[in-house]
Amino acid sequence: MRLLHLDSSILTDTSVSRRLTAQVVQDLHAAIDDLHATYRDLAAAPIAHLSGAIAAGFRPLPQPDSDAASVAEHALSEQLVDEFLASDIVVIGAPMYNFSVPTQLKAWIDRIAQPGRTFRYTANGPEGLAGGKQLIVASSRGGMYAQGPMASLDFQEAYLTATFGFLGVRDVYFVRAENQSRGPGPAAAALISAQASIADVVRSVARGVVHTRVEA
């Protein structure tokens, strides 16, 4: 069983999303035997944003006259897609930045959203090719966006749900810590609530993994 763990917060010791993903991964290891993890820190080791040259290298393979940089970027794109497709569980730390996801996470998504690899177009419309995965997103936000007057500005969780759904990933769980910029009291209460929700999420994911194993 393979786990892909991604962090994208530009913060380190003070990052709420990193604290949450660390606890999620720890609890997953305790709940699921033989869980092999691959970790990427998308902020510490950022992936280059999509360019014309990088996109041209998705498919087919780079031409013989491609420069070394293009060949290297193609190899990285292939590695990122392979890691994603090979994973049974994906854990993503995704704080809200300016109502959306960190640019570092968007760069990774742009590499793995490849026609013919993770989705395809058919006569009946687009079809995701990355189904069967369990996705857990550790979501941290400065204010309250799950409900209330700011809900319409949520282009973070809504974007992730839509994007991974397009790729075929239907089982998406959010561990959400809101109000992180609303003072120590509300921030601490929201973090405690998010941490308390992890146990239920891990149980649900573990059940899904067992169900997948039985079907296989």
From Swiss-Prot:
An MF annotation (GO) of this entry: oxidoreductase activity, acting on NAD(P)H as acceptor
Reaction(s) catalysed (UniProt annotation): 2 a quinone + NADH + H(+) = 2 a 1,4-benzosemiquinone + NAD(+); N,N-dimethyl-1,4-phenylenediamine + anthranilate + 2 NAD(+) = 2-(4-dimethylaminophenyl)diazenylbenzoate + 2 NADH + 2 H(+)
Transmembrane segments: none
Enzyme class: oxidoreductase
Residues making up the signal peptide according to the UniProt record: none
Annotated binding of FMN, by residue: S9, S15, V16, S17, M96, Y97, N98, F99, S140, R141, G142, G143
Cofactor binding note of this UniProt entry: Binds 1 FMN per subunit.
EC number(s) recorded for this UniProt protein: 1.6.5.-, 1.7.1.17
Keyword tRNA processing: no
Swiss-Prot/TrEMBL keywords: Flavoprotein, FMN, NAD, Oxidoreductase
SUPFAM superfamilies: Flavoproteins
Record-linked Gene3D superfamilies: 3.40.50.360
Pfam families hit by this protein: Flavodoxin_2
Cofactor(s) required, per the database record: FMN
Similarity comment: Belongs to the azoreductase type 1 family.
Functional note: Quinone reductase that provides resistance to thiol-specific stress caused by electrophilic quinones. Also exhibits azoreductase activity. Catalyzes the reductive cleavage of the azo bond in aromatic azo compounds to the corresponding amines.
Subunit (UniProt): Homodimer.
This protein's name: FMN-dependent NADH:quinone oxidoreductase 2
Source lineage: Bacteria, Pseudomonadati, Pseudomonadota, Gammaproteobacteria, Lysobacterales
